[in-house]
Amino acid sequence: MKEQTEIGKIKEGRYIVIDEEPCKVVGLATSKPGKHGAAKARIDAVGIFDGVKRSIVSPVSAKTYVPVVERKSGQVISIAGDMAQLMDMKDYSNFEIAIPEDKKGTLEVGKEIMYIESMGKRKLD
């Protein structure tokens, strides 16, 4: 899910959709309006799920999309290799999620963990 907003209203640390991928804004620079042109904004962002750095240059008044990023909790049902099966604590739905390298030794069956969900994708927090 995503919402529409103006480029000028985006701040560092917020989220933005670039190339249909939700990204966290890490850098923001705006130029002054000139004699013949509008102010422009350069946004540098890093993908939430893939870690790829992306940037866009756009007029401040242009519209863009902002993803709805939700932090949820889930209970670990089982662990198989680098995948974990989780159950959402709100609606009790089951799903599989990849385990990042830094979390491999800390996950235990029955333990509650936080995860991020946005635009149909999930990632351990």
UniProtKB/Swiss-Prot annotation:
Keywords noted in UniProt: Cytoplasm, Hypusine, Initiation factor, Protein biosynthesis
GO (cellular component) term, any one: cytoplasm
Main location (coarse class): cytoplasm
Role summary: Functions by promoting the formation of the first peptide bond.
HAMAP family membership: eIF_5A
Protein family (similarity comment): Belongs to the eIF-5A family.
Keyword Nucleotide-binding in annotation: no
CDD domains given in the database record: S1_aIF5A
PROSITE patterns: IF5A_HYPUSINE (PS00302)
Localization per Swiss-Prot or TrEMBL: Cytoplasm
InterPro entries, sorted: IF5A-like, IF5A-like_N, NA-bd_OB-fold, Rib_uL2_dom2, Trans_elong_IF5A_hypusine_site, Transl_elong_IF5A_arc, Transl_elong_IF5A_C, Translation_prot_SH3-like_sf
Taxonomic lineage from the root: Archaea, Methanobacteriati, Methanobacteriota, Stenosarchaea group, Methanomicrobia
Family matches, as Gene3D superfamilies: 2.30.30.30, Nucleic acid-binding proteins (2.40.50.140)
Modified residues (Hypusine): 35
Identification of the protein by name: Translation initiation factor 5A
Keyword Membrane: no
GO MF entries: ribosome binding; RNA binding; translation elongation factor activity; translation initiation factor activity
GO terms under biological process: positive regulation of translational elongation; positive regulation of translational termination
